[in-house]
Amino acid sequence: MAENDVDNELLDYEDDEVETAAGADGTEAPAKKDVKGSYVSIHSSGFRDFLLKPELLRAIVDCGFEHPSEVQHECIPQAILGMDVLCQAKSGMGKTAVFVLATLQQLEPVTGQVSVLVMCHTRELAFQISKEYERFSKYMPNVKVAVFFGGLSIKKDEEVLKKNCPHIVVGTPGRILALARNKSLNLKHIKHFILDECDKMLEQLDMRRDVQEIFRMTPHEKQVMMFSATLSKEIRPVCRKFMQDPMEIFVDDETKLTLHGLQQYYVKLKDNEKNRKLFDLLDVLEFNQVVIFVKSVQRCIALAQLLVEQNFPAIAIHRGMPQEERLSRYQQFKDFQRRILVATNLFGRGMDIERVNIAFNYDMPEDSDTYLHRVARAGRFGTKGLAITFVSDENDAKILNDVQDRFEVNISELPDEIDISSYIEQTR
């Protein structure tokens, strides 16, 4: 395992491994707007109403988007005018598209100048955001995008910046800071500064220091946008310090975990009964793709191996493997080459795999925030999904009660039979 490879970088800050950096999850923020239980709200107005560039509209049509979601409807009109934005919205509501479209709309590419900087807390999320930029800039051939994160050679990054300087840079704070300090990355022309899953970066003091140092290297006059699914009352003032009179949008209701179309159940069992129960459920449930969350790297490796031995097409992703391997496996799963993914919390936040319709908490998450991020992997984009949580001791039961109390949701015991139409889209 490439432990040193990972630990030498001030980057990965994964939830499941305390020794890299102390995990500090934010708490859900109070609502300013009630979404009335609709997960991806449909607005009659289309993207055309935002008066976007024709090249962007063509790419949006190619991606199959017809109507903006609630968060897009609220944010995009202000964001494309260059306003600072602080936005909290549930997972899967299309936050990424807000800043991708808003920055591409305003971008006037200048050769050799980086004008957009997007940072997030994990390499996988950085990789995914860079792919979104590529998707939406499909008809903007002059726009160059690059992604920089630790675990891969910094020399290659320096080479890219020197020979083929991007207009848009996506990355993790540790690597971005290293490139800025050694003068490879010039931040003097930044016009848009974006933090995705901002609470993750600003709650951890070492990462916050990196972000602050990078921020100070950018011009005073710029647009700042921050997004997250969880934004505690404590972290909001920290976010505001980076901004000038931001528009604040909270498209959420903290008291309800109404992930639209998501069925949630628990199973009481002993720890040594989990494998048998999991195999039985994978046999009887209909699924497109499944994500199974475990609490450690060792359990992740062992369970994936066991599933393969039982003829379940599983693949594992955890922070103990080299970066190239992780990205390659993520892409394999995304491309539907494997239907079952076993993962640590590394995969629990911000990852978009449209075909996932079942999420298992094989091991109970450590708190209600992590529960939200994990189960939101199923039933994203307003589709149906199923979340099943294994409860094996009193601590597990306590966390499940916390989830139910906090989100005012009733998670009932898994029945013997579940109506397939309740958790999978029926195609006729």
UniProtKB/Swiss-Prot annotation:
Modified residues (Phosphothreonine): 172
Intervals of motif DECD box: 196-199
Localization terms from the record: Nucleus; Nucleus speckle; Cytoplasm
Positions of region (Disordered): 1-31
Residues carrying N6-acetyllysine: 36
Pfam families: DEAD, Helicase_C
Biased composition (Acidic residues): 1-19
CC annotations in GO: cytoplasm; nuclear matrix; nuclear speck; nucleus; protein-containing complex; spliceosomal complex; transcription export complex; U4 snRNP
GO molecular function terms attached to this record: ATP binding; ATP hydrolysis activity; ATP-dependent activity, acting on RNA; ATP-dependent protein binding; identical protein binding; mRNA binding; protein-containing complex binding; RNA helicase activity
Domain of life: Eukaryota
Tissues expressing this chain: Highly expressed in liver.
SUPFAM superfamilies: P-loop containing nucleoside triphosphate hydrolases
A single GO BP: mRNA splicing, via spliceosome
Keyword annotations of the record: Acetylation, ATP-binding, Cytoplasm, Helicase, Hydrolase, Isopeptide bond, mRNA processing, mRNA splicing, mRNA transport, Nucleotide-binding, Nucleus, Phosphoprotein, RNA-binding, Spliceosome, Transport, Ubl conjugation
Catalytic activity of the protein: ATP + H2O = ADP + phosphate + H(+)
Stored CDD domains: DEADc_DDX39, SF2_C_DEAD
InterPro entries referenced in this protein's UniProt entry, alphabetically: DEAD/DEAH_box_helicase_dom, Helicase_ATP-bd, Helicase_C-like, P-loop_NTPase, RNA_helicase_DEAD_Q_motif
Binding of ATP, residues: 89-96
Class in the EC hierarchy, top level: hydrolase
Xref: SMART domains: DEXDc, HELICc
All residue ranges annotated as the Helicase ATP-binding domain in the record: 76-249
Motif (Q motif): 45-73
Physiological role: Involved in nuclear export of spliced and unspliced mRNA. Component of the TREX complex which is thought to couple mRNA transcription, processing and nuclear export, and specifically associates with spliced mRNA and not with unspliced pre-mRNA. The TREX complex is recruited to spliced mRNAs by a transcription-independent mechanism, binds to mRNA upstream of the exon-junction complex (EJC) and is recruited in a splicing- and cap-dependent manner to a region near the 5' end of the mRNA where it functions in mRNA export to the cytoplasm via the TAP/NXF1 pathway.
Subunit structure comment from the entry: Homodimer, and heterodimer with DDX39A. DDX39B interacts with the THO subcomplex to form the THO-DDX39B complex which multimerizes into a 28-subunit tetrameric assembly. Component of the transcription/export (TREX) complex at least composed of ALYREF/THOC4, DDX39B, SARNP/CIP29, CHTOP and the THO subcomplex; in the complex interacts with THOC2. THOC1-THOC2-THOC3-DDX39B subcomplex is sufficient for the interaction with export factor NXF1-NXT1. TREX seems to have a dynamic structure involving ATP-dependent remodeling.
PANTHER family: ATP-DEPENDENT RNA HELICASE DBP3
Name of the molecule in the record: Spliceosome RNA helicase Ddx39b
Origin organism lineage: Eukaryota, Metazoa, Chordata, Craniata, Vertebrata
Gene: Ddx39b
